[in-house]
């Protein structure tokens, strides 16, 4: 018996104590050592006895017994014969489960190339032999010979010979040389490789070569050769002579009812290989003719290819049902593959799912669980209780009792469930709040009851949603569920730090109704002793809920010592607000409750409560608010009736006026005063404005009503119209929706996104006519199609983000860096988009913040800025703070807590072990489904942005112009001639108040440094056309303006004026293609006039569609328009918005026509032009001049002789993040990506903290390219993890060697995920085959640092509660290593076990051999 216990213990304790996994190529000997015997026959099982055939694919002698402890012939049965090998059938008596891990092998009659190393690009075999893939394939598939040993002939090694050439050579030289065909030839070449010699040659070549492409090629090959050298892999192992056979239980053969069998496709593929192999052996024994043998060898190669990766080469082999067979490669890749289906997405026991419904009477930490479900989920617990109480004698009896549902069982269930948390999950789980823990309350019925306040976190509604229930079993699991996942511990959103437990819909409406004021309501002016008395008056009908009254209120306020002190005052309020005050916790001020509470105000209230009083009080408050809200929503009786949609009286007048304006524009168009594009734009502007006016009239009408007050005078008050109240409170609906119900529907879009110029003037209350209805259907259908696309795209974005950031964990408290990023308030136009306090809240200060204008330290370095500090920042009006950021954090693998700052979901400095990468990915991905797919929101956003034509300042101050170049026209006004000018308004302290972009050709009334008053208009321009401004006075001379070739002349019939329109290059005849229409300015003598302070002639090239109204030879003054270019339809070009834009930014994609940035700082000049390009030269103060060719059609922002700084914009366009990183550095690129991503989310009203985006940027920047390697282990031009270079440089600094030089590189998230150090993580993401091939050849080691790798090998993740476990292991390992270092360093390699993965304990290394 003792033996048995020992044996079972030994069985369960497999050696999973490893810290590294290594992957490599398997040598033939290795494969034979795993194997338990050779598979010689293609047979599987005997059709009569169903026993496995001997030496077949399911042979019991090779793979182990079919029944536990029983040999095949039945001679030995039972446990006592354990380990005996039966002499009759040769089967070892042991457990059946060995059939899951015992492998076999096939001895191949001729070598076969492994398709992964051949066809997975770049071909590893091709790279190492330095032969093109086509040639290698010709050799492998027996079309050509390859010379393996040239001997004394004039053939070369690796040369290909056709059949004829081979025969000729044989006649000529006899057996002086050797040439082979098929995999043997390739194997021979690989075996003869002298890796060291090759490496040396490559290094020499690298020194000598100058061409960039050659360098790249050599570096690639050198890296591969070095990888082979270091990993101990041999190149000839890429060609197999032995094929491993998978254990039979991993490719099962299952009998179905009806005598048929279901089999794994692998068995078919193996059968093919064995059949062909056996046939080839026979042919070789018979010495068959060459051509037959060759054909058989080729077929063998093809069948092995199909087994390893079906469909990689040629047509995929199909089964009986015409569908391709699933090969070994297909088993592991893709969504259904081993990685994603079984290792990362396992099914869970003790779980159930059901429909959810509302539980308005629950507490926040509770959920209603149907009794039936609970009984099933908690079965084992009930059995054990029944048994331990002696109610049931055995487990079987207990089971019977539970099945009969005896009354005692329910009592025990209630006891078991008490304080045992359960997890609820709603798919899709887009962020961590999609799984939360609750205490179950047993209920009748079959639906799970959910607390209404957590619906926002789960994104749940009750229209048939289902949720899954999971039971945490172990004590640790229950503890984590209670301490970390309980719904009461997740009040704040991890994305923004705002409360996510906020009331919505009914509750908001109830509270809003309850806290509204009404003029002259019953009971107005009464006085009450306390809120209870006020409530009594309301309940007895003495006073209305909305009556303005005076109530004595007792507030509890904190004094200096931080104790709560009661203060009682008589305050003006309403009865409803006084009643609501009764649920307020001590320590909250009354002013928060004494207002009309909309959704935003309630959110603020809960936030305030959380910051002031902590978690417990806030949770109780949230619950109370919910109960009160529901009660008063029911009392309010708010409902929607058709008469609530009041149509404004002015509507018809507004529409008539708009129609008249449109008719006028149409007249102008007919008489040729405006172009078609301008007409279209103006029409759309007119209708957009009309729509706004109707909406405004309607909202004024709806939102206020006139009533008679107590004095008998009329007074305006907010309306009690139900529709208005719902929208105003934020319960449901919005102004935009009310506009469609009671205003006019407005402009609609065609399916391609362009705007139809006839708007829908009707609204839903009036009803649409057929045409209007038809136009509406476009939008509705597009909306549905978009939603479907959006969900998939958003999910994929989230997956890529999680993958790139998954291994980022807080690993230390402080990395000690002084670096950081500079934060200023975000100002766009006249509004502050985001105040400084909101941007720095929860960050750690990187440098002391000084009081403005003094040397006094206001906030010391390394302070975490909380709400109190924010008030200080506001009070002292600080406008720039340097904060620490994850992008500049110095921690090697991970981030430090100080650089990350506050844990947004908890409100304190983040803890070590927090998986910030995953949280960041979820926070960015989760709102993804709310972002539009459409290029932009139709009508609203597009036309409003395009209509601006002047700048009116909102604050007094001083004007500052940046990047401005201008001329002064004859009226003395300033006309801008620069393209990206910014106009800033600065107050007396030098703080930026407003910030505007001013277009080219704008007329400014104020110069740089001038004072402005509030409301002054400082700039104006024509929004529909862009002028070409003359910078000198003179006479116009046409150049290359040829009627009918480059321009067309248009004459206006009414006015007789003629204008010239330049044709697009694409539309011109061939003769006009190379002509460049331009206007030159000349003096009286006909000489070119130079642009002031340069030696460049004033000539202006005209782009296509430009319109010139001046004649040749006309006189012109400075600052006048020479021509105008119509701005095409309202900014529909290239506004990628919403989700695609975010994806583009994170993928770091290069835009189509990127901005051209200055590569160095210096003076601009123009060199010799070529046909289609001009030469731009930048000459620095010292050093080499830099030149580049720029296409002539690009508009330049710089003039001859101008000074530019490195990274300045030379030609407009979308900026490329790669350029920004190269020219302006890491901070600039971080700013760019963070601001651009935030721009998209802000437009949708989604709040995400900057630091989440910074976390992703850090991961995008984690690679560097080596620019100067010196004598380090790196190669020049190699891509390496930044942390590895930093570690190497620290070591070099200690040794006094020069530091390795490198440049940071920006990778898109997909690329960055695939370029991660961990091959397991990369393989489970995308392109599994390629990643594994690359890793195997290089003999990569996976240090198991990230989360994914650890989930895949089945361990606790190194984050959260698993963080400490991993740290302790590392500590132990270090202690052991130090102890070992004192002993003699003898290390013996144990023989590897017969498993796919061989593991080694001596230095805790695990090797995964990848052959099949």
Curated annotation (Swiss-Prot):
GO MF term (any one): magnesium ion binding
A Pfam family hit: RNA_pol_Rpb1_3
Positions that bind Zn(2+) 1: 71, 73, 86, 89
Catalytic activity, reaction form: RNA(n) + a ribonucleoside 5'-triphosphate = RNA(n+1) + diphosphate
GO annotation (BP), single: DNA-templated transcription
Binding, Zn(2+) 2: 815, 889, 896, 899
Sequence positions that bind Mg(2+): 461, 463, 465
GO cellular component, one term: DNA-directed RNA polymerase complex
EC number: 2.7.7.6
Co-factor requirement: Mg(2+); Zn(2+)
Free-text remark on how the cofactor is bound: Binds 1 Mg(2+) ion per subunit. Binds 2 Zn(2+) ions per subunit.
Described purpose of this protein according to its UniProt entry: DNA-dependent RNA polymerase catalyzes the transcription of DNA into RNA using the four ribonucleoside triphosphates as substrates.
Family as reported in the entry's similarity comment: Belongs to the RNA polymerase beta' chain family.
Complex and partners: The RNAP catalytic core consists of 2 alpha, 1 beta, 1 beta' and 1 omega subunit. When a sigma factor is associated with the core the holoenzyme is formed, which can initiate transcription.
Family matches, as NCBIfam families: rpoC_TIGR (TIGR02386)
Protein name: DNA-directed RNA polymerase subunit beta'
Gene that produces this protein: rpoC
């Amino acid at each position: 018996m003792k033996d048995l216990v020992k044996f079972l213990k030994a069985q369960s304790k497999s050696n999973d104590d490893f810290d590294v996994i290594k992957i490599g190529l398997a040598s033939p000997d290795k494969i034979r050592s795993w194997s338990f015997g050779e598979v010689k026959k293609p047979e599987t099982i005997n059709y009569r006895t169903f026993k496995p055939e001997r030496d077949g694919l399911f042979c019991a002698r090779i793979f182990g017994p079919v029944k536990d402890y029983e040999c095949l012939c039945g001679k030995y049965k039972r446990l006592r014969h354990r380990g005996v090998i039966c002499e009759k059938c040769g089967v070892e008596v042991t457990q059946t489960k060995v059939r899951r891990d015992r492998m076999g092998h096939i001895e191949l009659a001729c070598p076969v190339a492994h398709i992964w190393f051949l066809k997975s690009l770049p071909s590893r075999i091709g790279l190492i032999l330095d032969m093109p893939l086509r040639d290698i394939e010709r050799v492998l598939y027996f079309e050509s010979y390859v010379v393996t040993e040239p001997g004394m002939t004039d053939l070369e090694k690796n040369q290909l010979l056709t059949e004829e050439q081979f025969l000729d050579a044989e006649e000529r030289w006899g057996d002086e040389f050797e040439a082979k065909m098929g995999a043997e030839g390739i194997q021979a070449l690989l075996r003869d490789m002298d890796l060291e010699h090759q490496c040396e040659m490559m290094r020499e070549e690298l020194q000598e070569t100058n061409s960039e492409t050659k360098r790249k090629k050599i570096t690639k090959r050198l890296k591969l050769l070095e990888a082979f050298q270091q990993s101990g892999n041999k190149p000839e192992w890429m060609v197999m002579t032995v094929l491993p056979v998978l254990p039979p239980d991993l490719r099962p053969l299952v009998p179905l009812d009806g005598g048929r069998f279901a089999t794994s496709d692998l068995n078919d593929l193996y059968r093919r290989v064995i059949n062909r192999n056996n046939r080839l052996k026979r042919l070789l024994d018979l010495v068959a003719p060459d051509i037959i043998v060759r054909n058989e060898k080729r077929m063998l190669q093809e069948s092995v290819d199909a087994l390893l990766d079906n469909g990689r080469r040629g047509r995929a082999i199909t089964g009986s049902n015409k569908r391709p067979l699933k090969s070994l490669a297909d088993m592991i890749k893709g969504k259904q593959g081993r990685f994603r289906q079984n290792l990362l997405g396992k099914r869970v026991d003790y779980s159930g799912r059901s429909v959810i419904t509302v539980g308005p009477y629950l507490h926040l930490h509770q959920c209603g669980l149907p009794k039936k479900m609970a009984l099933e989920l908690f079965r084992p617990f009930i059995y054990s209780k029944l048994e331990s109480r002696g109610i049931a004698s055995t487990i079987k009896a207990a089971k019977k009792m539970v099945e009969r549902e005896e009354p005692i069982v329910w009592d025990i269930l209630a006891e078991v469930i008490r304080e045992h948390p359960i997890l609820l999950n709603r798919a899709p789980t887009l962020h961590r709040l999609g799984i939360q823990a609750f205490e179950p309350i047993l209920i009748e019925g079959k639906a799970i009851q959910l607390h209404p306040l957590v619906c926002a976190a789960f994104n749940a509604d009750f229209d048939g949603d289902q949720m899954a229930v999971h039971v945490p079993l172990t004590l640790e699991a229950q503890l984590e569920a209670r301490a970390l996942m309980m719904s009461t511990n997740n009040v704040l959103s991890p994305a923004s730090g705002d409360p996510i437990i906020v009331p919505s819909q009914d509750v908001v409406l109830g509270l809003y109704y309850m806290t509204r004021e009404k003029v002259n309501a019953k009971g107005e002016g009464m006085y009450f002793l306390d809120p209870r008395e006020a409530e009594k008056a309301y309940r007895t009908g003495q006073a209305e809920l909305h009556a303005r009254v005076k109530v004595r209120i007792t507030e509890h306020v904190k004094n200096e010592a931080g104790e709560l002190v009661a203060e009682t005052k008589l305050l003006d309020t309403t009865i409803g607000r006084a009643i609501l005050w009764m649920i307020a916790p001590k320590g909250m001020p009354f002013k928060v409750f004494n207002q009309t509470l909309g959704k935003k105000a309630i959110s603020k209230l809960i936030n305030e409560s959380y910051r002031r009083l902590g978690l417990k009080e806030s949770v109780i408050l949230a619950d109370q608010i919910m109960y009160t809200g529901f009660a008063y929503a029911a009392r309010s009786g708010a409902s929607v009736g058709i008469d609530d949609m009041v149509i404004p009286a002015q509507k018809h007048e507004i529409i008539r006026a708009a129609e008249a304006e449109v008719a006028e524009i149409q007249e102008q168009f007919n008489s040729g005063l405006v172009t078609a594009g301008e007409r279209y734009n103006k029409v759309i502007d007119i209708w957009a404005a009309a729509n706004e006016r109707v909406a405004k009239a309607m909202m004024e009408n709806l939102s206020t009503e006139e009533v008679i007050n107590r004095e008998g005078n009329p007074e305006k008050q907010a309306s009690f119209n139900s529709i208005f109240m719902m929208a105003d409170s934020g319960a449901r609906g919005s102004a935009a929706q009310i506009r469609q119900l009671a205003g006019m529907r407005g402009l609609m879009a065609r399916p391609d996104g362009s705007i139809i110029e006839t708007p829908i003037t009707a609204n839903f209350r009036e009803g649409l006519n057929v045409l209007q209805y038809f136009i509406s259907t476009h939008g509705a259908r597009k909306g549905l199609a978009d939603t479907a696309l959006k969900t998939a795209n958003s999910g994929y974005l989230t997956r890529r983000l999680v993958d790139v950031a998954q291994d980022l964990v807080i690993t230390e408290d402080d990395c000690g860096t002084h670096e950081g990023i500079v934060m200023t308030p975000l100002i766009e136009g006249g509004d502050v988009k985001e105040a400084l306090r909101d941007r720095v809240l929860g960050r750690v200060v990187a440098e002391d913040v000084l009081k403005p204008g003094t040397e006094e330290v206001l906030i010391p370095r390394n302070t975490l800025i909380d709400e109190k500090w924010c008030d200080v920042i506001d009070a002292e009006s600080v406008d720039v703070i340097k904060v620490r950021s994850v992008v500049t954090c110095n921690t090697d693998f991970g981030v430090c807590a100080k650089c990350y700052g506050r844990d947004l979901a908890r409100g304190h400095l983040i803890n070590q072990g927090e998986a910030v990468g995953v949280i960041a990915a979820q926070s960015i991905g989760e709102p993804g489904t709310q972002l539009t797919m459409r290029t932009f929101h139709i009508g609203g956003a597009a036309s409003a942005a395009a209509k601006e034509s002047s700048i009116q300042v909102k604050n007094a101050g001083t004007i500052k112009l940046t990047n401005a170049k201008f001329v002064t026209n004859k009226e003395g006004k300033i006309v801008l001639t620069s393209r990206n000018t910014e106009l800033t308004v600065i107050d007396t302290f030098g703080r930026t108040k407003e910030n505007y972009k001013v277009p080219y050709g704008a007329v400014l009334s104020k110069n740089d440094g001038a004072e402005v008053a509030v409301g002054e208009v400082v700039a104006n321009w024509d929004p529909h056309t862009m002028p070409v401004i003359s910078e000198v006075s003179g006479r116009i001379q046409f150049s290359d303006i040829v009627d009918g070739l480059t321009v067309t002349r248009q004459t206006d019939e009414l006015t007789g004026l003629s204008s010239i329109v330049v044709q697009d290059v694409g539309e011109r005849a061939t003769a006009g293609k190379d002509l460049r229409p331009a206007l030159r300015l000349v003096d009286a003598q006909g000489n070119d006039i130079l642009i002031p302070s340069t030696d460049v002639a004033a000539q202006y090239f005209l782009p296509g569609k430009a319109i010139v109204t001046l004649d040749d030879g006309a006189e012109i003054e400075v600052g006048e328009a020479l021509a105008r270019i119509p701005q095409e339809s309202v900014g529909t070009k290239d506004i990628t918005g919403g989700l695609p834009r975010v994806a583009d930014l994170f993928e770091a994609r290069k835009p189509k026509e990127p901005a051209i940035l200055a590569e160095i700082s210096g003076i601009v000049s123009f060199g010799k032009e070529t046909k289609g390009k001009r030469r731009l030269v930048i000459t620095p103060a010292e050093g080499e001049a830099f030149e580049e060719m720029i296409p002539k059609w690009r508009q330049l922002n710089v003039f001859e002789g101008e000074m530019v700084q490195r990274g300045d914009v030379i030609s407009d366009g979308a900026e490329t993040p790669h350029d920004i990183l190269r020219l302006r550095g890491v901070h600039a690129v971080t700013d760019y990506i963070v601001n651009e991503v935030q721009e998209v989310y802000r437009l949708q009203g989604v709040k995400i903290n900057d630091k989440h985006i910074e976390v992703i940027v850090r991961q995008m920047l984690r690679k560097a390219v080596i620019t100067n390697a010196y004598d380090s282990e790196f190669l020049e031009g190699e891509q390496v993890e930044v942390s590895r270079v930093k570690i190497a440089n620290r070591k070099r600094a200690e040794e006094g060697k020069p530091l390795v030089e490198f440049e940071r590189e920006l990778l898109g998230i997909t690329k960055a995920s695939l370029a991660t150090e961990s091959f397991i993580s990369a393989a489970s993401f995308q392109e599994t085959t390629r990643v594994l091939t690359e890793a195997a050849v290089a003999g990569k080691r996976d240090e198991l640092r990230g989360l994914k790798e650890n989930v895949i090998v089945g361990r606790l993740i190194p984050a959260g509660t698993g963080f400490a476990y991993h740290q302790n292991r590392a500590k132990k390992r270090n202690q052991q290593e130090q102890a070992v270092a004192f002993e003699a360093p003898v290390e013996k390699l144990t023989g590897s076990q017969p498993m796919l993965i061989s593991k080694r304990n001596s230095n805790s290394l695990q090797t995964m051999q990848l052959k099949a």
